[in-house]
């Protein structure tokens, strides 16, 4: 075989391998959940002896989301957003605590998770439509009540991004939120998959844009967080978080305006604060929303 032909075959093989690696990363990170998972059994608020109803929620791109409303005794609502590919029941612990403190609580399942319509996952880029649709449904069902957002991991990032530009939102608490998903993707490629970044991150994002229309680089909570001010922000992050390093929380805090607070939890991993010390965690979160929504969200007459 001639040298030019050998070089050509080598280049072609390398390109094919690179394309396959990009496809594998995309599939592992953003693939749809299998039907067996989407249809899995789940806990409901009834298992916590809490009354609830299902809200009709339809996103701008025509996806129906499983959504629970736990009616409270105060004229204020806290919307709880779970993590990436999370289950709606994941947030029932903190949701029940907020409900017992008098708040109405809304929990929902992201697109592509159990009970909601199937759709590709986009690490928050398209999921912002989900939270906006939930806020619309709350307005339709309960009227213009003050709303606080509590989000975990991707849910925290989405809560910051949506809350920054939605005047219906009076306060945001974000636990283990990432500052921007591109940095997070590059970190995971480098440290967890041992792959070069951004050599693979850029084509993976391009593949996502072609398949879902989501432009991950345009979803940057760290660029939006300053617009929350003067509404209060509470950031919670464990300093042993291996999924979203605590530096993400520090970046968000540095970019935010006042009033803001960063609660760093020593030795705690990803979204582990609630489980590390339920009493302290619940007290801190409820106190935050008491102060943020207190005047507007007093007891109903």
What do the PLM-derived regions correspond to, one by one?
Residues 6-58:
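An N-terminal hydrophobic leader/cap segment in hydrolases
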Residues 84-97, 110:
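The serine-hydrolase catalytic nucleophile loop
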Residues 98-117:
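Conserved alpha/beta-hydrolase
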Residues 121-142:
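Alpha/beta-hydrolase active-site loop
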Residues 161-217, 223-226, 231:
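Hydrolase active-site cap/lid region
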Residues 228-229, 235-237, 241:
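Short beta-strand/loop motif that positions the catalytic acidic residue
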Residues 242-248:
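Conserved alpha/beta-hydrolase "acid-adjacent" motif
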Residues 268-282:
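Catalytic histidine-centered segment of alpha/beta-hydrolase-like enzymes
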């Amino acid at each position: 075989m001639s040298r030019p032909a050998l070089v050509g075959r080598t280049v072609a093989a390398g390109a094919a391998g690179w394309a396959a690696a990009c496809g594998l990363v995309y599939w592992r990170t953003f693939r749809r959940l299998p039907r067996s998972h989407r249809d899995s059994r789940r806990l409901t608020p009834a298992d916590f002896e809490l009354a609830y109803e299902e809200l009709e929620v339809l996103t701008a791109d025509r996806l129906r989301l499983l959504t629970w409303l736990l009616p409270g005794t105060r004229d204020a609502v806290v919307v709880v957003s779970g993590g990436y590919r999370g289950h709606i029941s994941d947030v029932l612990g903190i949701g029940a605590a907020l409900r017992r403190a008098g708040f109405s609580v809304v929990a929902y399942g992201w697109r592509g998770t159990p009970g909601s319509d199937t759709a590709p996952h986009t690490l928050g880029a398209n999921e912002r439509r989900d939270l906006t649709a939930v806020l619309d449904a709350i307005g339709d069902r309960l009227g213009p009540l003050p709303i606080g957002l509590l989000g975990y991991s991707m849910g925290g990032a989405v809560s910051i991004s949506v809350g920054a530009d939605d005047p219906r939102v009076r306060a945001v608490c974000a636990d283990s939120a990432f500052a921007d998903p591109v940095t997070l993707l590059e970190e995971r490629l480098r440290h967890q998959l041992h792959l070069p970044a951004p050599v693979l991150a850029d084509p993976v994002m391009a593949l996502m844009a072609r398949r879902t229309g989501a432009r991950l680089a345009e979803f940057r909570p760290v660029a939006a967080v300053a617009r929350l001010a003067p509404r209060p922000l509470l950031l919670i992050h464990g300093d042993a978080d291996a999924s979203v390093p605590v530096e993400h929380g520090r970046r968000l805090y540095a970019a935010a305006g006042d009033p803001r607070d960063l609660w760093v939890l020593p030795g705690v991993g990803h979204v582990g604060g609630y489980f590390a010390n339920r009493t302290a965690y619940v007290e801190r979160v409820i106190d935050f929303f008491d102060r943020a929504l207190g005047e507007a969200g007093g007891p109903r007459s």
